[in-house]
Amino acid sequence: MIALIQRVTMARVQVAGRTQGEIGAGLLALIGVEQLDGPAQAQRLLERMLDYRVFPDDAGRMNRSLRDTAGGLLLVPQFPLVADTASGNRPGFSRAAAPAPARALFEQLLGAAQAAHAPVAAGIFGAHMELTLTNDGPVTFWLAVPPAATAPEA
């Protein structure tokens, strides 16, 4: 499971011209779900997003986390994050989870985030979304929690 996190002073996601979610200072996280991802990957990714130290302390060093700052978290599903771009001129999406399990895992991640932190907002899985954001820094990181090594046995 992948999160591309960006430190922002504000971020908003709109669907069909209507604001779906909005935060002030905090993290915008674009989320990609891979085929073998499950609840363990979602939970670990959430912990990393909440505890990753990307906010400045009093000395200006990145020593504070989202939990420390009580900043907002905007989760936006984005399946192209798991694209294979190693060759050719067109991305391949064979690593991406199918829509139904990806949606379920994104919703699980969102629910866990809302239970663990506030404020949390989100985009809509499968919708065409428009994002407005102001990067702070800019500070952008790629967080990845590898999928399970093998598919669960039947």
Indicate residue ranges for each PLM-predicted region.
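N-terminal, polar/charged subdomain of small-to-medium soluble alpha/beta proteins
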Residues: 1-88, 92, 104-154
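An anionic oxygen-ligand recognition environment, strongly enriched in 2H phosphoesterase
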Residues: 95
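Short, conserved glycine- and acidic-residue-centered signature motifs
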Residues: 98, 102
